[in-house]
């Protein structure tokens, strides 16, 4: 009797090896995310009568601050992986092997979206102040591109065989090579493809935010800032659930895979951001109601 075994398997982290330089999937996906995000954000800026060139102007600082924030956040909470003999890593450039601090080896994986959001927000606030742009409106323009970039970027985890969930035998199970498995699960071959769960969830959020963006000027319900707060709520809701499946969490007071005796950092931050989003929408609605009352009075 023939039994077909279906599962997902990464082809590896390398997209193209040209000999003198290696192009990895993670870096390629980040680049694709940036280009698509640039296109989408310019379209949305034009729809809000904001100079689309502002998107091009902020892009370099936004990329740098987001990547630095995401990497710093991860390294701080996983310092044991980057200290001592792991402080440096090898990098191939023009047929030569050079040593660089592991902190800068972003293409090897190890970034945290919450750190990227913090770094990016700092850059956005500074830019809006310097250009005298409404902060809430500008963030609403950028948010759809950010969540779409998160959806695309999650596939970098797939190619790197990282950020997967606990063992499973579901039809869409993900095969993980033994060298990438946690010690606790060496005897298991198949795991939850949490990268796929989050990628699809983020894609749904992107579609919902674009629909709301197109209705924002037609109703007072979706005031400037609504999209940003809804992003915090929806992304945090999905991330909290998905994080509970992962075997490589950043922990406070505990150790992976389950943060025994501690708490998963991403879940803690998700609760905070979810609550912040709810409070933000509450005050937006309160301000809208007060404005209507003053107008009617």
Swiss-Prot record:
InterPro entries: Lgt. It is an enzyme of class 2 (transferase). Its main location: membrane. A 1,2-diacyl-sn-glycero-3-phospho-(1'-sn-glycerol) binds at residue 154. Keywords: Cell inner membrane, Cell membrane, Membrane, Transferase, Transmembrane, Transmembrane helix. GO terms for molecular function: phosphatidylglycerol-prolipoprotein diacylglyceryl transferase activity. It holds the Pfam family LGT. It is found in: Cell inner membrane. One of its GO terms (cellular component) is plasma membrane. Belongs to the Lgt family. NCBIfam families: lgt. This is Phosphatidylglycerol--prolipoprotein diacylglyceryl transferase. The lineage of its organism: Bacteria, Bacillati, Cyanobacteriota, Cyanophyceae, Synechococcales.
């Amino acid at each position: 009797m023939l039994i077909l075994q279906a599962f997902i398997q990464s082809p590896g982290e390398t997209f193209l090896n040209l000999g003198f330089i290696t192009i990895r999937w993670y870096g390629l996906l980040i680049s694709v995310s940036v280009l698509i995000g640039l296109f989408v954000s310019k379209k949305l800026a034009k729809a809000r009568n904001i100079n689309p060139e502002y998107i091009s102007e902020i892009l370099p600082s936004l990329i740098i601050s987001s990547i630095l924030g995401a990497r710093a956040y991860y390294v701080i909470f996983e310092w044991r992986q980057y200290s001592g003999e792991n402080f440096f890593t090898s990098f191939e450039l023009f047929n030569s092997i050079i040593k660089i601090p592991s902190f800068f080896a972003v293409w090897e994986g190890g970034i945290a979206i919450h750190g990227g959001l913090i770094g990016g927000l700092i850059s956005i606030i500074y830019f809006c102040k310097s250009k005298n742009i409404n902060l809430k409106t500008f963030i609403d323009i950028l948010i759809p591109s950010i969540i779409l970039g998160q959806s695309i970027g999650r596939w970098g985890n797939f190619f790197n065989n990282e950020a997967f969930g606990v063992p499973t035998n579901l039809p869409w199970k993900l095969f993980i090579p033994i060298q990438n498995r946690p010690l606790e699960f060496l005897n298991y071959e198949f795991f939850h493809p949490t990268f796929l769960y989050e990628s699809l969830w983020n894609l749904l959020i992107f579609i919902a935010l674009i629909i709301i963006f197109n209705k924002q000027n037609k109703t007072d319900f979706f005031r400037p800032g609504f999209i940003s707060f809804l992003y915090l709520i929806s992304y945090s809701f999905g991330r909290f659930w998905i994080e509970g499946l992962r075997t490589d969490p950043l922990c406070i007071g505990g150790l992976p895979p389950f943060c025994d005796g501690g708490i998963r950092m991403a879940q803690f931050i998700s609760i905070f951001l979810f609550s912040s989003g709810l409070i933000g929408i509450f005050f937006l609605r309160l301000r809208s109601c007060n404005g209507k009352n003053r107008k009617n009075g």
